Amino acid sequence: MKIGASTLAGIEFDLEKSLEFIESLGLDYAELVHQYPAERIDKDLLESYNLKYSIHAPFMDVNIASPQDQSRLNSIKQIESSIDLANEVDAEAVVVHPGTSSFLASKYFKKEVYEFSNRSIKEIGDYANDLGVMATIENMPNFDTMIYQDIHALNELLEEYEMYMTLVIGHANHAGYSADEIIFDSIKHVHAHDNFGDDDAHLPLGEGNIKLNDIINSLESKNYKGIYILEVNDFDSIKKSYEYMKKNF
């Protein structure tokens, strides 16, 4: 079982502090949140740690579903820079958000927003494939601005495009899915965090009401070979979540 942690837990600190902590726990993988304040990441720095990597493409002020051409194209360009980084450091996956829909766009142009997202996802997937990088798309939580909260619709799109999903366990729970509704062959990467279904809280594993054992055992029974990234709020939560994984699996 491959287990790692996201640098999101230490986003307010220097990247080195997060990587040092993740390495100190004995984890094998770190997922680099490739946006401010870590927009520029030194390959030599990464190679100084006994870690392997995945990349989370930027999502702050980035929207690949934007109806505005310049915003959408700039967002795709930023994500392509994360794919370039993944190629340079031999990262196992790049994680991409499918985009958001503003109030006005949701009211008048919801169909078009999904069409723009789909077009962008295909473009990103093609760019990644050309470099031999695996791009994955997240299922999203139950917030008004989020698209692809419907995990089944996302899976259908990714199957059509021959692309892959990052299953975000906490997002699926927040969107109302049970453990037996969210296992697909398209899943090649996992973000693990807990909640009570009322918020996307990113709690340590075991501190919410998600049936984590059922989900992870189902993935393992399908011969899942990807990484389980602990995507929680702080360093202590990484430690608690890693202890949960070691105790239960």
Predicted feature descriptions by range:
Residues D61-P67, S102-K107, G197-L203:
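A short acidic, helix-capping loop that chelates divalent metal ions and anchors anionic groups
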Residues S6-G10, V33-P37, P58-M60, G99-S101, ...:
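Active-site beta-loop-alpha junctions enriched in small/polar residues
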Residues M60-V96, E207-S221, I229:
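Ligand-binding grooves and catalytic loops that recognize ribose/phosphate and carbohydrate rings
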Residues Y29, S54, T136-I137, T166-I169, ...:
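Generic enzyme active-site microenvironment
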Residues M1-K2, E12-E23, A91-E92, I147-N155, ...:
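Histidine-acidic metal/acid-base catalytic patches
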